[in-house]
From Swiss-Prot:
Seems to play a role in epithelial tight junction formation. Appears early in primordial forms of cell junctions and recruits PARD3. The association of the PARD6-PARD3 complex may prevent the interaction of PARD3 with JAM1, thereby preventing tight junction assembly. Plays a role in regulating monocyte transmigration involved in integrity of epithelial barrier. Ligand for integrin alpha-L/beta-2 involved in memory T-cell and neutrophil transmigration. Involved in platelet activation. This is Junctional adhesion molecule A. Belongs to the immunoglobulin superfamily. The gene is F11R. It is a single-pass type I membrane protein. Residues 259-298 are cytoplasmic. Residues 1-24 form the signal peptide. SUPFAM superfamilies: Immunoglobulin. Disulfide bonds join C49-C108, C152-C211. One of its GO terms (biological process) is actomyosin structure organization. Residues 25-237 are extracellular. The keyword Transmembrane helix applies. Keywords: Cell junction, Cell membrane, Disulfide bond, Glycoprotein, Immunoglobulin domain, Membrane, Phosphoprotein, Repeat, Signal, Tight junction, Transmembrane, Transmembrane helix. Glycans are attached at N184. It comes from Bos taurus.
Amino acid sequence: MGTKAKVGSTELLLFTSMILCSLALGRGAVQTYEPVVRVPENNPAKLSCSYSGFSSPRVEWKFTHGDIRGLVCYNNKITASYENRVTFSDTGITFHSVTRKDTGMYTCMVSDEGGNTYGEVTVQLIVLVPPSKPTINVPSSVTIGTRAVLTCSERDGSPPSEYKWFKDGVEMPLEPKSNRAFSNSSYTLNQKTGELIFDPVSASDTGDFTCQAQNGYASPVKSDTVHMDAVELNVGGIVAAVFVTLILLGALIFGIWFAYSRGYFDRAKKGTSNKKVIYSQPNARSDGEFRQTSSFLV
């Protein structure tokens, strides 16, 4: 009991000192009792903001999440875009029912109307949403010695999900050499993005692959299982295809040469050049009698 009382007295002394220093520097004291708030989706959430040292406080709440910016409260009043979902009080703001889009950073800014005293504090709101079934992308067949990229993702989880991979029902470690079952594999696994890269692919990489998404809220969710075959490069097939192509190309060249040697191209040229057109001027006749005489001789 004595130790707890001593700790409580120390915290009170520090808080009082902070207020006095803030007043001396022209800066009000603003604090929150819960800097990180975690709430399941569709539940109410209270973001606390208490302040002192302001003669006529004006409170604003600003929202940021990545590139998104918003104003929740301005001059002690909830803005139009939030007025049906949020309530303002001297101790903070309260969401009636949060959605996943409400996840982000909320900054409580307090100032005097004259602007001489100012203070702020930031509260992080994390709306908890269970992960959905991950979408998996696994090639059905890859060539041994090449690079293969397997992906796994889901968009609903909040906070964002992390990913695990399973091969033939066994969890794949981050370091393949740490598990004898994967010691012959060479891969990198990114738990944040869900990307699994084999580089290079080996014969032992053939198997059934499954991905699992988890974000620490609700139960992990697994994807469908997809089979991948690691196959040898078909050198014989490539050689056969090249051989057939060369035969066809040779036959085409021979056909052109044969036609040329038999004079088929020359005959075609002569047949075109022998066609002549003879045109004879009409004889002079009377104005009342006109007749065009022309003949075409082929």
